[in-house]
Amino acid sequence: MSALEKSMHLGRLPSRPPLPGSGGSQSGAKMRMGPGRKRDFSPVPWSQYFESMEDVEVENETGKDTFRVYKSGSEGPVLLLLHGGGHSALSWAVFTAAIISRVQCRIVALDLRSHGETKVKNPEDLSAETMAKDVGNVVEAMYGDLPPPIMLIGHSMGGAIAVHTASSNLVPSLLGLCMIGVVEGTAMDALNSMQNFLRGRPKTFKSLENAIEWSVKSGQIRNLESARVSMVGQVKQCEGITSPEGSKSIVEGIIEEEEEDEEGSESISKRKKEDDMETKKDHPYTWRIELAKTEKYWDGWFRGLSNLFLSCPIPKLLLLAGVDRLDKDLTIGQMQGKFQMQVLPQCGHAVHEDAPDKVAEAVATFLIRHRFAEPIGGFQCVFPGC
């Protein structure tokens, strides 16, 4: 995910844990920007790329869950966008602007459970089955019994969830499926390296600007424009941090409560709590989701994914970075013409962020080729050779 997703493909990117394009350390702290140049790492609001935002309420046995969606467009099929693990719907921001300018379509970018601004009663359940049901429930809550034509597009973990959703027939009006940057074989091979990758990431950041700068310099996201909007959905303020004065009073309160403990353990406990709070004060931003704690679900996301993808009886598109490799099942399926594939060179794992225009062109061409959507502004299809 630039976090989890990238780690899952450790074996195929040239820059695993040394991250792509860097040739340097994971932290990216020593990477050079070029003499005399200063880039703008300030965050950009979602409203520069999406037309509206909505919190969709879904009823279930435990109560109400609220799913954040970002929307654009008013005509044509709905492109339902599912992000990778650790990311959010905002990772689709630049792609949204690009695709809307090429074909008539509607965008619905969804924050999956435990990600972004979505709030659910059971955030620990990240099984493929549960997340696929979430997608179906959101579609039903938004459109009722007569949903418009929908194409599912997912990146990495989101691509796997799109496939599980499609194979379970949870979206009745589904007309197409697109999987980006995920292949079962390489994903499964990389699972053993994932925890090491996650441990190598910074745990906290001094500011949003600092987080954005790290994501670009480390190679997590190679496109600064996308990073400036996408990273806002990946990090959050540490809990309990409001102001320096507020933080100080919290530390003092902790110390007073500890005074009744035995002297030896008391001083150690106090120092640890003070150190933790000082870290939060100096680095008040952290990741929205602790991906390392989701390990028990990783296998379920990707095992059997190739056959599930091939079995979906709808037009399918697979977009891969230049370093991706097809596994045996996908290779045979591609030779048999069971799906359209396009390789986008010079991209990292976050293909749709690194090259949003190329991905938009590929998706737009797919939509027009199958007569799912009409072109806009004289857009000319470029049909790939594979």
UniProtKB/Swiss-Prot annotation:
Its EC number is 3.1.1.89. Residues 1-38, 254-280 are annotated as: Disordered. Residues 254-265 have a biased composition (Acidic residues). The modification Omega-N-methylarginine is found at residue 16. It holds the Pfam family Abhydrolase_6. SUPFAM superfamilies: alpha/beta-Hydrolases (SSF53474). It comes from the Eukaryota. The keyword Phosphoprotein applies. It catalyses: [phosphatase 2A protein]-C-terminal L-leucine methyl ester + H2O = [phosphatase 2A protein]-C-terminal L-leucine + methanol + H(+). The modification Asymmetric dimethylarginine is found at residue 16. InterPro entries: AB_hydrolase_1, AB_hydrolase_fold, PPase_methylesterase_euk. The modification Phosphoserine is found at residues 15, 42. The active site is at 156, 349. Phosphorylated by SIK1 following increases in intracellular sodium, leading to dissociation from the protein phosphatase 2A (PP2A) complex and subsequent dephosphorylation of sodium/potassium-transporting ATPase ATP1A1. Residues 268-280 have a biased composition (Basic and acidic residues). It is an enzyme of class 3 (hydrolase). The keyword Transcription does not apply. Keywords: Hydrolase, Methylation, Phosphoprotein, Serine esterase. Binds PPP2CA and PPP2CB. Belongs to the AB hydrolase superfamily. Demethylates proteins that have been reversibly carboxymethylated. Demethylates PPP2CB (in vitro) and PPP2CA. Binding to PPP2CA displaces the manganese ion and inactivates the enzyme. This is Protein phosphatase methylesterase 1. The lineage of its organism: Eukaryota, Metazoa, Chordata, Craniata, Vertebrata. The gene is PPME1.
